[in-house]
Structure formats: C-alpha cells, structure tokens
Amino acid sequence: MKATIVTIGDEILIGQIVDTNSNFIAKELDRIGVETYEMISISDDKQHILNTFAQLQNKVDVVIVTGGLGPTKDDVTKKTFCEYFDDELVVNPEVLAHVTELIEGFYKRPISQLNKDQALVPSKCTVLHNKMGTAPGMWMKKENTVFVSLPGVPYEMKYLVENEIIPKIVKEYKRPYIIHKTILTYGQGESLVAERIENWENNLPEFIKLAYLPNPGRVRLRMTARGTDKEVLEKAIEENVQSLDAIIHDIIVGYEENETIETVVGKLLAKQNKTVSTAESCTGGKVASLLASVQGASAYFKGSVVSYATEAKVNVLGVSQDLIDQFSVVSAEVAAAMALNVKNILKTDYAIATTGNAGPSKGDSEAEIGTVFIALATPNGVITEEFNFGQPREKVIDRATIKSLEILQKEILKIVQ
C-alpha cells in the first residue's frame, strides 16, 4: 500500500515555516505498513492542487493533504475538493455544533460567519471530526485512490492522524508488515563502513533493504524488511544483525533509531560509574551542552569551564603562561594541561579539553584555520589528538564537539570490551 503526502501553503514554499507535518504522517503510516511513495509541497493555487490530484489519481492508494482548510480566502482546499469530486459544499450539523460550542462556550465570543463556514464540507465526504480545532478533516474516494484532507495546524493534524486516519486505514485496508532495525556506528565514515560490510550487504535477502544514514561522527545503518509473514521478517532481521555484529562489532554502539552519541556516552559512563568534565575553548561549551542534554546526566557529568580567552585558561584553569608562551594557546600541550587541570578541579574520572582556531581569521593564533587539539584526561594519563576540520566556523565547532565525544567513547569502550 502506497501513500503520497501533499502539504499546501505558500508559507512552506517561501521558507517561512518548516514542514514537520509530513515527517509525522510518514512515521505513522510506516508504523502500520503503509509506504510513503513521495512528499510534495505545493502553493495555495486551485489549479496547481487540481493538477497534483490528477497526477496522483490511481498512482497511489492514499493521498493525505494538509493545509488550506482555514476560513480565509487563501484557504482553497475544500472548494478544490468539490471541483475535483464534482461535489458541492453543505453545512454539516455536527461540525457546526462543535464550532459553535468551541467559539461561544470556550472562547466566550460571538460566532462569526467565517467561523460558521468551517462547518461547510463536500456533501459526499466522510467527515473526520476534529476535537482540537474548528476545521474538520475530509475523506473522499475516487476510483482506486482515497484523498484525505487535514488541517495544517500540527496539533490538530496529529489528533486526526492518530484518532481517525490510522484506525480507518487499519480497518479498511490489508497491508504488508514493515520492520525496521537501526544499527548505530561511531568513529568511521560512510564509505569505510560500506567497504567493510560489502559482502554482507550483497548477501541480504531481496526483501531486506539497507540504507546508510550518515551524520557527523556516526553512521546509522537502517535495515527495512517488507513482507506478509511477520515472524519470517523478524527472524531474518535478527539473523542478519548477528552476522553484521560479527563484522563491525568494534564500531557498533547501539540499536536505537534516535540514539545520539551523547546518549551512548552517557550510558557508558553510567554503566561504569565514571564521571566526566570539560574545559572548552574553541567549542565554547558545546561539548558540555550535549552531555548535559541527556536525562540523568547529573550522575556522570560534573561541570565545565569555558575558557575561551587566554586569561581564563591561566586564571581559572591554572594553565601556565610559560606553557602558552612556549607552545601557543592552540597546541597539544595546552590542551593536555586544560584537561588535566579541569579533571583535578572537578575531581572526575575523565576530562575533555578543546583548543583551536575555528576561523574565519587566524586572529592571535598561528595555527591554520580549522586546526583543533582535543585532549582527554583519563585515569591512566592524557590522550591528545590534532585535527583540521577545514571551514566554515560552524563546521569546525560541530565536528570538534562530536569528535571529542567520540574520543571519550572509544576510551571507555576499551574498558568495557
């Protein structure tokens, strides 16, 4: 079963708002075995909408449309539905009663004609009652395709998807099973991971597809199995995950879709009952921010010193001015001193330190733009690594932040493994 999601609104096309509706709808459809064939964003233009509907007719099983259901002149979806289905707008008594109660009872103001117009729906549609707002959803079928119209307001759309659309599709359509399994890897790029697992990937059964989802510092491998026998799919996924683990066990750190590196590091620290602190210069507290963003971080994250200026490194962290004069503020030696000193100050098992030149100009540093030194103080000594993350500034900061957590993760995994 295939679906297309259509978002209507000029505000999306000019970048004024971000379309989060399609993301939510696609996830909900995937959960019940409906494949999202495509996502389309179009303008508030009746002819454009009609052309889109005609193109999608019989191409997919379900077209879910969001937006354009408001009471103003630029909201044209209902009238367009009427034209496409050769129908007319009529007042739905239940919707009118709901709108009246909401406006007069809840908001305590007289109902206007624009409010009343929200109760106008195509006479042939199945009304999807919207308890969260005034605009009802609409369900209409033409030949082999169902067209569903939903309000664009996210919380109203979510209510109708969860309480009307999904239950109705489940009841009326037979669908295949879709099973996903996500493998989280850290520390190696997409091409290297692909090279390592090439033979394994080539031997996957036809009903299992593999997708590479790279992010800075990590690659997610998402396996998707589709078929009619759920037990067969689950067994095949599990067997292939086990064989994959035997190949890249050294870089697999989890199996949850949305698990981030800060979450993985947090779990490792908590499991080992270890603590961490940070001393940051070029990353400006971003490493600390990621660590602190995880629920329960207080169990292992003790604090941070953002020593952006040289005087902060000297006066707060206690880094020797002589050391800075000898090696420069952007150096392995200064990074190591920062890590050791914050580890001692906050009495943690591990400490991360960053110092570098993120650009856009060299400033007081002689280091090339993009140069970053990352130090990790451990119970057994200090590890320092030099990187050049290039440009622009934002990229340098983000990559240095992720790399810092990668280094910590690898060091902890040496103990765990």
Swiss-Prot record:
Disulfide bonds: none annotated. InterPro entries: CinA, CinA-like_C, CinA_C, CinA_KH, Competence-induced_CinA, MoaB/Mog-like_dom_sf, MoaB/Mog_dom. CDD domains: cinA. Gene3D superfamilies: CinA-like, MoaB/Mog-like domain. SMART domains: MoCF_biosynth (SM00852). Pfam families: CinA (PF02464), CinA_KH (PF18146), MoCF_biosynth (PF00994). Belongs to the CinA family. This is CinA-like protein. It comes from Flavobacterium johnsoniae (strain ATCC 17061 / DSM 2064 / JCM 8514 / BCRC 14874 / CCUG 350202 / NBRC 14942 / NCIMB 11054 / UW101) (Cytophaga johnsonae). The lineage of its organism: Bacteria, Pseudomonadati, Bacteroidota, Flavobacteriia, Flavobacteriales.
